[in-house]
Amino acid sequence: MGRYSVEPDNATKSCKARGSNLRVHFKNTRETAQAIKHMALRRAQRYLKNVIAKKEIVPFRRFNGGVGRKAQAKAFGCTQGRWPKKSAEFLWQLLRNAESNADYKGLDVDRLVIDHIQVNRAPKMRRRTYRAHGRINPYMSSPCHIEVILSEKEQVVAAPSPEEDAPKKKQSKKKMARQKLMQRD
């Protein structure tokens, strides 16, 4: 079992999944992972399916050199975006694996949220391409490691209404003394 970069706050209410040396572009996968961070599991799976179908876009914020501008990116408050199909498929499979782990642990799958997702660079894989005049250039790939931690969302407790438990207004010592005098009279 591999080591994770963070440990969940509540290990009994969370589950993990990871993939190592995945042959998918690091930069595209990092942007896709940032897009689904802190999403509910069901929403993230739906989002990734929409990315594969080009119905929703992945905003490119860090690795955005040469990335074209798209109208769909306005929903995320930026202008540049793409639909990295392979990255979305790899992340979707990883989320499915984490969902199976949660189901095995007996967690409520509908209340799961992506608490932590991280994409790291893996060692580059080397190939070669043949150029003019007998030269050879490197033809590298940039694989990545992905880890995800899902946690059960806490139940939201309704706040008490203001009529039931209204906080008393603070009074100055002078005003309290005046009220005591009035009560004595």
Swiss-Prot record:
Residues 169-178 have a biased composition (Basic residues). Transmembrane segments: none annotated. One of its GO terms (cellular component) is cytosolic large ribosomal subunit. Keywords: Ribonucleoprotein, Ribosomal protein. It holds the Pfam family Ribosomal_L22. Residues 157-185 are annotated as: Disordered. One of its GO terms (biological process) is cytoplasmic translation. Belongs to the universal ribosomal protein uL22 family. This is Large ribosomal subunit protein uL22. The gene is RpL17.
